[in-house]
């Protein structure tokens, strides 16, 4: 099964674009959804986070508001949190891929925000970056989502610059225009992906 790493900075429309690949029989794994699941259900990880970030465990779950407040005061602790979360999400990711292989899906879109930052491109067959202009990104994140501007800048500081991501990607999808335009780009890329020979699973996972 072909493994496609799809990434993009915050506010680029990454997850919306990833979901479009479902129309072309690709399975979609969402790393952010996995993190949310872990915060609410994975007791081992919840307790590890509580040890590193006292007070983050509220009613048996990780409080994202508490974490957000702590990280906004001390952005350097992003790395500490990631060191706990990323190994856990990787195990969930591998489990998902195995399930999709059993279902004989033609490919799996791995929607991973920090694909390049964590070296994840080594473990996929193809990388796709979703991009948009700085103005569009700001509009979505600040005006539509209501994210604090300082926190937005702190998140960006943890992510690889958009231009560098685009340069490293095998394919780039722009979400500057309307949804129909993005969908056409997805259709074009999906048609190319189905012709590729899967290698990443056997090379890096199935050992």
What spans do the regions from the language model cover?
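ATP-dependent NMP and nucleoside kinases share a basic, alpha-helical "lid"
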Residues: 94-103, 107-144
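The conserved Walker
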Residues: 10
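Post-Walker A helix-loop "phosphate-sensing" segment adjacent to the P-loop in P-loop NTPases
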Residues: 22-31, 43-44
């Amino acid at each position: 099964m072909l493994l496609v790493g799809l990434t993009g900075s915050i506010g680029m429309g990454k997850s919306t674009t990833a979901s479009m690949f479902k129309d072309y029989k690709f399975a979609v794994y969402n790393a952010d959804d996995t993190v949310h699941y872990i915060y609410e259900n994975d007791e081992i990880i919840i307790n590890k986070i509580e040890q590193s970030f006292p007070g983050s465990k509220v009613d048996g779950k990780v409080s994202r508001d508490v974490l957000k407040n702590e990280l906004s005061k001390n952005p350097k602790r992003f790395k500490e949190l990631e060191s706990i979360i990323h190994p856990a999400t990787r195990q969930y990711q591998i489990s998902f891929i195995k399930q999709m292989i059993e279902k004989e899906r033609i490919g799996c879109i791995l929607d991973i925000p920090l694909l390049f930052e964590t070296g994840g491109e080594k473990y996929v067959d193809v990388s796709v970056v979703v991009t948009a202009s700085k103005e569009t990104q700001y509009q979505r994140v600040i005006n539509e989502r209501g994210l604090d501007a300082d926190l937005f800048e702190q998140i960006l500081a943890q992510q690889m610059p958009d231009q560098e991501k685009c340069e490293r990607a095998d394919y780039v999808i722009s979400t500057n225009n309307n949804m129909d335009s993005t969908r056409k780009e997805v259709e074009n890329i999906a048609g190319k992906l189905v012709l590729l020979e899967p290698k990443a699973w056997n090379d890096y996972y199935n050992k």
